[in-house]
Amino acid sequence: MKCSLIITTYNRPEALELVLLSVERQTVLPEEVIIADDGSDDKTQAVINNFQSNKILNIQHSWQEDKGFRAAKSRNKALSISTQEYIVLIDGDMVLHTHFIEDHLKHAQKGFVIQGKRSLLTKKRTSSAIKNQTTLFSFLDNGLQNHKNSLYSNFLSRLFASKKTHLKG
């Protein structure tokens, strides 16, 4: 199975750059990366152009005019141009674990949505990560605000995972 990775963003080119670096470092690359841009300026476009020129990722830029906060419309526009049957949605400040896409594809099942949690970095640790282009973080990192979400364990994942079949959408 292949997937589209949709990344929402708005005027945080330095964060988007770090996210795209983490995407390039995946053990399994997404078939396409679509940047769902809610009206960012030229600095975001420059970051996207730089990654497009690397040719490691197949990146499309789905941009809409800045008319206020319209993230849902931006995401929907990106969804409409995706070419894969499996979609992964993330925010433009989510640095991915190296197995993020691989794990999504491994656990994908028709009729189910996979939802996870993220680890939050302190403002100081975020600045440091952007400056040093750090995409790997340790469970013991002092800059984490919620350490438990940074644990990576297939055993624990299976132990705490739950399927909710009663939800309708």
Can you describe what each PLM-predicted range is?
Residues 65-82, 99:
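Glycine-rich, basic loop-to-helix element that forms the pyrophosphate-binding segment
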Residues 87:
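Short aromatic/hydrophobic "clamp" motif used to bind/position activated sugar donors
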Residues 12-25:
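Short, well-formed alpha-helical segments that are part of the catalytic scaffolds
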Residues 2-4, 32:
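Cell-envelope/extracellular polymer assembly enzymes that use nucleotide-activated donors
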Residues 99-136:
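Conserved donor NDP-sugar-binding/catalytic core segment of glycosyltransferases
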Residues 133-169:
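Short, flexible, basic/aromatic active-site loop/helix in glycosyltransferases
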Residues 22, 29, 37-46, 68, ...:
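A conserved acidic beta->alpha catalytic loop
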